[in-house]
Swiss-Prot record:
Belongs to the thermonuclease family. The keyword Hydrolase applies. GO terms for cellular component: plasma membrane. GO terms for molecular function: endonuclease activity; metal ion binding; nucleic acid binding. It is found in: Cell membrane. This is Probable staphylococcal-like nuclease CAN1.
Amino acid sequence: MGNSIYRFLCGLCSPSPEYQPHGAHPAVAALGRDIQQFEATSQVPDGLSRHVVSSKKAQANWYKKLIVTWKKARPTPRTPEEAARLVVTTLKNHQKADVEGFLVFYGLPIPNAAASTPAPHTAHVPKPQGCKFELHTLPVDAKAVADGDTITVYIDTADPRESGNVPREIQKAAAERTRARAARDYQKADGLQKMIADAGYRQVPNARGEEVLAKKYRIRLRGIDAPESAMPYGKEAKEALLKMVQGKSLKVYVYDEDRYGRCVGDIYCDGVFVQEQMLKKGCAWHYTAYDQRPELAKWEKQAQSGRKGLWAASRPQKPWEWRRDKRNGTA
């Protein structure tokens, strides 16, 4: 009898390759270890209840399901993203606050429904020459457009570019805020929202209206300079940009970062090159000091010839000269 107990206890202490495969991320190994532990003892981990809203009886039901799906998984999850997808698929019919809290407990990323479903295969399209990285945004909010050449966008943290970089405390705060809002504890939710925002994140709606955690980026449209808000045609330029992008998901090719910490990039909306439209409508100048692309000069010339937008004025002032005069006190 004593030997049997000894072998049983040793079995609990020894990690099984089935649950903790070689090379697994520490967060994945922790989840695998707890699933193995539950199979042997029927005990859920201490501390999980602080992250979820359901009872320990319900939690035990989750681990029963995870035992089955974990054993069937081929290959066994090794990365946080793989483990998160398995958890979301296994617990898809459970409360969102529970699923997110479970993921936060293990330090796993919180994917949305779209991210948990494999995307259809598409041909690889190389990035333009000089492009450092590419962003795919969530739908743009009306307040995101500062003027005719600057826009704030948000990237879902389930995106492969972001998923491994979200601080664990921000994942935890987002899950806690979701639960606080569900419980109508708006004071707590507002405090957590400030913490999330201070770290450069925000919970925003995705294309299906589901609130997801997202990373904030400020984008400066590459190659154009729109009139400042206080300049003639400044408000019209802002409205033109807003009309194009509001409620739309954008593709952004980022080439550089300016001195204000903004990403300098080309923006596409439904396949349309946004800077091209801004120039053709006479809503911006070609910013030749920073971008000499001939097509930008051509589109600006077309607007000038047609006296469109800001070119309807006899002598429109260049935004960079207006800013210089303002700095010098001569504006």
